[in-house]
Amino acid sequence: MPLLQLILVALIQGVTEFLPVSSSGHLILLPRLTGLEDQGQAIDVAVHVGTLAAVVLFFWRDVRAGLIGLPRALIGRLDTKGARLALGLIVATIPTVIFGTFLYFTGLSESLRSVAVIGWTMLVFGVVLYIADQRGPIDKSASDWGVRDAVIMGLWQMLALIPGTSRSGITITGARSLGYNREDGARIAMLMSIPTIIASGVLLGTEVALDADVDLMRDMGIAALLAMASALAALALMMRLLRSVSFTPYVIYRVALGMVLLFIAYG
């Protein structure tokens, strides 16, 4: 793969994976604007690994607490913060697994990957994020997250399987509609991404593991490192800005990009 394409794909995926702007919406524009071919599943796996490493490193304290609490959560002992976090992440992932299985076996996952669908989801869910952010109460923090809210946010996250929705954007929408403050809502949404990124990475990885050669492994390593670095930078910037800035700038960007995609689809 050309080095320039490798860099562009890794940076786009890394920056947009955790911002509420949809990585798929950007990646579908790349070949149309540059004439480059699709990067392939192997590079998709690599950038997933890179973004997974980024979120684990950025929220390592929460990840450690969740891993330590996981055995207690599995036997129903929710007497620690880590156990409650682990249970919440498990519960929140279930709707996505069920819906993803449905899309896979019905073949709908491929039919949804059109420019028109991505344009509409970018636009519509951008507006939904704005409404939730501006009208939602701010009376909850991460310590209030329990099974009920995990189920609700998991149902929101399920919609992210429709390309253009933005996994981080839709889960943040769910968090704000439930009353979580912006910073903690984003933090919960980022932690919820870990099981889903692992699941999608494993699914893609099983399809490319036997076909990788030395050159491809090198490209995958470069892509993973670039995606991790750019994702870490994007996470740090967003979490810092959320202390004083709403999600409105992301909404404006989403709506504008959605309109561009709709123009491409119907123009």
Swiss-Prot record:
It is found in: Cell inner membrane. GO terms for cellular component: plasma membrane. Keywords: Antibiotic resistance, Cell inner membrane, Cell membrane, Cell shape, Cell wall biogenesis/degradation, Hydrolase, Membrane, Peptidoglycan synthesis, Transmembrane, Transmembrane helix. Catalyzes the dephosphorylation of undecaprenyl diphosphate (UPP). Confers resistance to bacitracin. This is Undecaprenyl-diphosphatase. It holds the Pfam family BacA. Its main location: membrane. Its EC number is 3.6.1.27. The lineage of its organism: Bacteria, Pseudomonadati, Pseudomonadota, Alphaproteobacteria, Rhodobacterales. It catalyses: di-trans,octa-cis-undecaprenyl diphosphate + H2O = di-trans,octa-cis-undecaprenyl phosphate + phosphate + H(+). The keyword Hydrolase applies. It comes from Ruegeria sp. (strain TM1040). The chain crosses the membrane at residues 1-21, 40-60, 85-105, 112-132, 188-208, 219-239, 245-265. GO terms for molecular function: undecaprenyl-diphosphatase activity. GO terms for biological process: cell wall organization; peptidoglycan biosynthetic process; regulation of cell shape; response to antibiotic. It is a multi-pass membrane protein. InterPro entries: UppP (IPR003824). Belongs to the UppP family. Bacitracin is thought to be involved in the inhibition of peptidoglycan synthesis by sequestering undecaprenyl diphosphate, thereby reducing the pool of lipid carrier available. It is an enzyme of class 3 (hydrolase). Disulfide bonds: none annotated.
